[in-house]
């Protein structure tokens, strides 16, 4: 991967870390594409198209967990306290009572929105790369917890010749720990220029950049040569089962096919990390249960018929 110290795209991504190799630059067929996590986002690949999942970039179940924990806390403590001290709140100090109720309503609304967003977000928002049409097809879901607007599905279609890639980096410090996450971003430019018209997050929430480098190389190889010159990877399991969901955040002890695949790809560095994180099972298991609830409630992605056919078979359909 040829990285840069200065972005070539305008406007610059606020979280920009580095540009990746240009789409039309020379492809190194000897580059090793052996990251253990390279296949965790592979939905499908054949002679016509490659479909990349984006589920690994979203921590599903967290919104449901927040909603459940808040509901239990409110029912066991907040509402009983309001009832028991009704006279003090609304007779002796009515302004304090109004403030308490306003805060309670706001917290209830926020927790409900987190849980609702977790359950309404589609199970996947995939991106398809078609070699025949030389286009990419993006399944987006527009939803904002900060703005009250209609949550909706949006399909974006761009020419492959418009696509470049960059790495974004987000870091934060709590004073005791330093957290870093990287993201592979597809940069959509105006034809023949580096003027950005859109940015699409393809894979995020990665601690290191190695898998992101290899994923971009994998996509470029597929679009240039087809499946013959890319590693033979096994597509991820796309169903939702209770057991696999329960161990979703602890795949190293999962008795499912996903667990066996994860263990077969483990490297020596994974073992000390597992040793440090397994003691938080009291968080991972409830979060896995909430992951199951969110994914069962979530709608499956449904492409419009014409776009779905075009993105799979490679024959451009007439779209209104």
Segments from the language model and where they lie:
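Membrane-cytosol interface motif
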Residues: 130-144
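Alpha-helical transmembrane spans
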Residues: 52-124, 248-320
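Short, non-transmembrane cytosolic segments of multipass membrane proteins
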Residues: 1-41
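Phosphoinositide-dependent membrane-docking surfaces
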Residues: 135-136, 147-172
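Short, hydrophobic/proline-enriched secondary-structure or compact coil segments at domain edges
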Residues: 43-57, 182-184
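Juxtamembrane amphipathic/hinge helix adjacent to a transmembrane helix
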Residues: 45, 50, 219, 226-267
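Acidic, metal/cofactor-coordinating or nucleic-acid-engaging core segments within structured domains
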Residues: 166-175, 179-185, 194, 215
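Canonical phosphoinositide-binding patch of PH/PH-like domains
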Residues: 185-223, 228-240
């Amino acid at each position: 991967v040829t990285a840069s110290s200065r972005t070539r795209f305008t406007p610059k991504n606020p979280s920009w870390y580095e540009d990746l190799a240009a789409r039309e630059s020379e492809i190194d067929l000897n580059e090793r594409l052996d990251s253990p996590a390279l296949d965790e986002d592979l939905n499908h690949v054949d002679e016509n198209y490659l479909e990349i999942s984006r589920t690994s970039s979203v921590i599903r179940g967290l919104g449901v967990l927040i909603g459940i924990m808040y509901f239990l806390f409110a029912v066991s403590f907040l509402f009983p306290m309001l009832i028991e001290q009704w006279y003090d709140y609304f007779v002796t100090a009515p302004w304090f009572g109004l403030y308490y109720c306003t805060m309670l309503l706001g917290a209830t609304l926020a927790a409900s929105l987190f849980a609702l967003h977790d359950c309404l977000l589609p199970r996947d928002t995939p991106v398809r790369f078609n070699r025949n049409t030389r286009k990419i097809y993006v399944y987006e879901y527009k939803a904002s917890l900060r703005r009250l607007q209609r949550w909706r599905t949006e399909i974006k279609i761009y020419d492959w010749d418009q696509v470049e890639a960059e790495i974004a980096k987000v870091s934060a410090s709590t004073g005791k720990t330093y957290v870093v996450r990287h993201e592979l971003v597809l940069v959509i430019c105006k034809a023949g220029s580096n003027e950005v018209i859109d940015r699409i997050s393809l894979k995020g929430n990665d601690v290191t950049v190695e898998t992101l480098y290899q994923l971009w190389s994998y996509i470029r190889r597929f679009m240039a040569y087809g499946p013959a010159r890319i590693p033979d990877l096994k597509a991820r399991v796309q169903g939702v089962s209770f057991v696999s969901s329960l161990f979703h955040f602890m795949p190293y002890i999962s008795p499912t096919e996903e667990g066996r695949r994860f263990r077969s790809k483990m490297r020596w560095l994974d073992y000390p990390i597992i040793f440090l994180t397994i003691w938080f099972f009291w968080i991972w298991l409830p979060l896995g249960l909430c992951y199951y609830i969110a994914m069962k409630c979530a709608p499956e992605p449904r492409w419009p018929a014409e776009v779905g056919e075009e993105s799979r078979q490679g024959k451009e359909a007439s779209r209104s």
